[in-house]
């Protein structure tokens, strides 16, 4: 049984479609995997028969210093051993979801209470109270959200709750911005699409084109936290990112 508070499965994995083709998706959440470093993930992928492909790293990479000066480097990429899912990371979620009976996945079901002695769960589903019992309970939730959104019975030690609240969530402050193109002009210029910037607002950029090359894309990480992004505003942030990409890659961007 899977209880999911949202209206969809996948959590922080989100791969919206750009075209109608099944493989034409962009990863707005987690993107890469490393078979050499993740043997259990590799075994799972093989078991589920999911196709993966190597991150595009051919060509030069760019470095932008704090003053906006650009340097071109031809050394090996830090993503030389990185792979991506054909069809986006959501392909893994969909394959796992297919292992469940449809009735075993309860969407829009927010867990409110967990009794760790009786292994019973209270939840709210579309405004209605729900109750479940289990032999084992596995919680897939960032620790800060867990500490502030679920009531445990009996009450957990205050030291444990404090440690949860003091545990940062990996990549929680990051924001992605994706640029989509009909042609991969950077590849034609012997540029891998890889950029590292100390100026920003985008601090890292990578080639995010899908395996089927139905379109081409550059994905970026914005080096501003949520408060800074809110202060700047969406329109000005997008304008600054577009200007930076033109500065880095030329008017084709």
For each predicted feature, which ranges?
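FAD-dinucleotide binding site
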Residues: 1-253
